């Protein structure tokens, strides 16, 4: 048992992913810069807290991995919303102790998977809520407003590229229904 476990730890002989072309790296980096500028400028010019620590990782996912299921708009916005809501419920209504934070994180991760809105950067939101001692307003600003803004920048910017197309889907339930209808209709014809 111990040997097989230790064998797993050494990894597999998978190659390191290739580096993107310099042109692509510049395109990605400029998109990330624009998204950070939008939320940064609005935060500083309006004095509203639109910036959230997990948004840096969200911006990475949206611009470096736009085809990933984790980068799709519903995953980004709803992932942030649900995990922040869970963090607030536990912080405000259960306890501000460490164990409450751990339970909030576990439930937030489970809900993202159940609801099919997994967005890894949003997993840090319960921790952020507890560390800041956030109140209920944190759910709307920065969580909802900020996540919508970075998705809007990603929608605009990623589609400027001739080789990128974002998003891949808005609602996976629609895609599943569409595929089922196509296969059912195809079988009838």
Tell me the role of every PLM-derived stretch.
Residues 1-81, 85, 89, 94-102, ...:
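Alpha-helical transmembrane segments and their membrane-interface boundaries
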Residues 50-65, 105-135:
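Pore- and pathway-forming membrane helices of multi-pass small-molecule/ion transporters and channels
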């Amino acid at each position: 048992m111990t040997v097989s476990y230790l064998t797993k730890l050494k990894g597999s002989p998978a190659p390191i992913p290739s580096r993107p072309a310099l042109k692509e790296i510049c395109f990605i980096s400029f998109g990330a810069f624009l998204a950070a500028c939008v939320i940064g400028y609005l935060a500083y010019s309006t004095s509203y807290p639109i910036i959230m620590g997990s948004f840096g990782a969200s911006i990475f996912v949206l611009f470096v991995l736009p085809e990933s299921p984790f980068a799709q708009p519903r995953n980004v916005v709803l992932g942030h919303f649900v995990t922040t809501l869970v963090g607030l419920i536990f912080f405000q209504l259960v306890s501000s102790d460490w164990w409450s934070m751990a339970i909030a994180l576990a439930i937030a991760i489970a809900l993202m998977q159940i609801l099919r809105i997994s967005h890894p950067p949003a997993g840090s939101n319960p921790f952020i809520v507890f560390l800041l001692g956030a109140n209920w307003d944190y759910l709307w600003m920065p969580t909802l407003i900020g996540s919508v803004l970075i998705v809007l920048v990603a929608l605009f910017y990623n589609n400027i590229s001739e080789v990128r197309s974002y998003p891949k889907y808005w609602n996976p339930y629609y895609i599943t229904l569409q595929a089922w209808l196509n296969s059912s209709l195809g079988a009838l014809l």
